[in-house]
């Protein structure tokens, strides 16, 4: 059997665009003599549509598309993902009509029949994720819901499709995304299909990429192989590519559509560099596979490019503050890689505290990237603000409030530049700064997009190296990239906000990077978990132990002082994070609508206080 795998760049909310793309690939697959063409989950309107799924007029458009696609199946079997609804009189949990995340299967203008002749041409997603940025149960009922309400056994709900072409019958199992990741659910669609002895399983997905996601999927495939042994069947995994967003998180899809043999080995693979592709594979042949390097760099570039194309359709200039620090240097390079230097304008807005070397770095970076660049001083604005505050009986103007004035004035200027240039602002914050509130509201928290908002500082350092490798030039000044050995970091020029004399960022780079990930990555941990690890001495076995020793945190008093500062900073910054721009998500825990936060103060409960006292007494 020849299968065309269509790794589609799905444009959320753009039904006509997606249908046109599908039709082109179907026509080409017919010319290539494919028997079946497979598209990703929710490929007609997008997967991350939020409450657009609740609008009847939009749902009506999606439903009409199913009949259109079915009419295209005269010469080829078509499998695609979209919404469907049944049992309209019963109603969903929210009182609206039922909606199902569905895999459709049509051939010769008809629905492909199932072995039990029930719900021909339709398979409902059974495992609905409700963790992280997934919220499936808000919008859909599951195949399990349908089976229970209609008194149908799961083996009949999860039933093989009988595809007959050229006098050859193939028994195919269809799944939708999470059905493959069924370990924590009450149903295992893969196991049921194996029991049905299907010829192979096709899993259609819109699975967002995060770091090492491909390794997690390979692990899950191997788990299925271990469970079923020789009974396991080949599996065709078809994923989306490109970018979709939920408002607060910009998610990238790497594609990486793969055909797995029954023993879990890879038979064939499409690109995993986030780009659209469509190829025809013969299940009886083997193909070369490949792995994309610098995947994080690729992900950020694609996120910016697709966000610009899909969301900012008026093609604005991208306005960026270039301080000469590593975050803004990396971001301006990412913008140029994604959009071209002609779409980017850089501004250096110095005060008396900005050193000549950082101003020179900003200038040189812009020059090497051929970016339109302007430099000026904010001193007059700072002085005018001081004078105004004095009129309101605030004198002297100093301390943190004075530092924030500088940051907010820069935000004000960037907003003005963007207004006059018809542009949007690129946010320069990284994940650690966002976690600890090391940013000024309405100052450096503004922007249309935060490319680095889910990247730790150590990841930003690695991105800087990758960018220099990409350009084969020192785009990011080497003095900004520290020398890092195990548990030791040496800067040519240490990170600084440059809002006062001799200022250095207060973060313990390496350790705090790890701690942010530890507290936010799904499934997340809390301070009590970490205190118990420290108290038991198990921290010495963690990957962060060398950093803790480097910063003197093997001393219990220093450790407690630091963790209390960390947690208080974390909680006091929640109100800032809520107002942060959309973040490009690249980890298993991103601020926004991934790791969801309520505004709650840092409070040490009785158990936490007791454990802290035990640690301070040296009873570890």
Please place each PLM-identified region on the residue numbering.
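Enzyme catalytic cores with a strong preference for nitrogen-chemistry domains
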Residues: 1-321, 332-343, 348, 368, ...
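ATP/NTP-dependent adenylation/nucleotidyl-transfer catalytic domains that generate, transfer
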Residues: 170, 231-233, 287-324, 328-620
């Amino acid at each position: 059997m020849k299968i065309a795998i269509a790794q589609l760049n799905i444009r959320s909310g753009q039904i006509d665009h997606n249908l046109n793309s599908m039709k082109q690939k179907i026509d080409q697959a017919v010319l290539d003599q494919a028997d079946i063409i497979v598209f990703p989950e929710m490929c007609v309107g997008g997967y991350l549509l939020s409450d657009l799924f609740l609008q009847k007029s939009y749902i009506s458009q999606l439903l009409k598309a199913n009949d259109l696609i079915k009419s295209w199946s005269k010469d080829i079997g078509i499998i695609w993902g979209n919404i469907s609804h049944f049992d309209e009189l019963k109603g969903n949990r929210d009182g609206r009509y039922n909606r199902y995340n569905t895999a459709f299967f049509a051939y010769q203008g008809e629905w492909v029949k199932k072995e039990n002749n029930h719900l021909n041409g339709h398979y409902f997603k059974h495992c609905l994720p409700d963790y992280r940025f997934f919220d499936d149960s808000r919008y859909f009922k599951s195949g399990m819901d349908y089976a229970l309400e209609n008194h149908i056994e799961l083996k009949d709900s999860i039933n093989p499709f009988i595809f007959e072409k050229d006098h050859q019958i193939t028994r195919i199992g269809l799944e939708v995304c999470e059905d493959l990741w069924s370990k924590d659910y009450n149903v295992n669609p893969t196991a049921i299909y194996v029991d049905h002895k299907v010829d192979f399983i096709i899993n259609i997905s819109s699975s967002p990429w995060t770091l090492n996601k491909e390794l997690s999927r390979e692990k899950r495939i191997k788990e299925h192989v271990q469970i079923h042994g020789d009974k396991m069947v080949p599996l065709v995994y078809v994923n989306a590519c490109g970018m979709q967003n939920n408002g607060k998180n910009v998610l990238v899809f790497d594609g990486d559509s793969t055909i797995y043999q029954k023993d879990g080995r890879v038979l064939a693979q499409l690109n995993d560099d986030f780009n659209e592709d469509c190829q025809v594979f013969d299940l009886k042949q083997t193909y070369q596979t490949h792995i994309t390097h610098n995947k994080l760099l690729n992900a950020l570039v694609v996120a910016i490019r697709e966000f610009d194309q899909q969301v900012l359709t008026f093609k604005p200039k991208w306005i960026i503050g270039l301080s000469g620090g590593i975050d803004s240097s990396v971001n301006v390079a990412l913008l140029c890689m994604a959009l071209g230097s002609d779409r980017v304008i850089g501004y250096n807005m110095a005060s008396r505290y900005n050193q000549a070397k950082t101003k020179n770095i900003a200038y040189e970076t812009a020059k090497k990237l051929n970016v339109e660049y302007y430099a000026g001083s904010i001193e007059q604005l700072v002085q005018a603000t001081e004078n105004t505050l004095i009129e309101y009986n605030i004198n002297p103007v100093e301390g943190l409030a004075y530092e924030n004035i500088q940051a907010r004035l820069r935000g004000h200027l960037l907003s003005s530049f963007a207004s006059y240039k018809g542009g949007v602002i690129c946010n320069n914050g990284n994940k650690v700064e966002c976690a600890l509130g090391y940013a000024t509201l309405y100052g450096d928290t503004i922007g249309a997009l935060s490319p680095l908002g889910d990247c730790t500082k150590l990841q930003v350092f690695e991105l800087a190296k990758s960018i220099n490798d990409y350009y084969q030039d020192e785009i990011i000044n080497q003095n900004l990239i520290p020398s890092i050995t195990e548990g030791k970091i040496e800067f040519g020029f240490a990170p600084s906000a440059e809002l006062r004399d001799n200022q250095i960022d207060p973060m313990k780079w390496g350790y705090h990077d790890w701690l942010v990930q530890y507290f936010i990555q799904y499934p997340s941990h809390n301070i009590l978990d970490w205190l118990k690890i420290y108290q038991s001495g198990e921290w010495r076995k963690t990957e962060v132990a060398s950093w803790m020793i480097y910063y003197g945190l093997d001393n219990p008093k220093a450790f407690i002082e630091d963790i209390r500062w960390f947690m208080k900073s974390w909680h006091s910054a929640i109100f800032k994070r809520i107002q942060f721009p959309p973040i490009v998500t690249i980890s298993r825990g991103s601020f926004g609508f991934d790791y969801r936060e309520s505004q709650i103060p840092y409070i040490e409960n009785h158990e936490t206080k007791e454990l802290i006292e035990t640690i301070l007494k040296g009873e570890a």
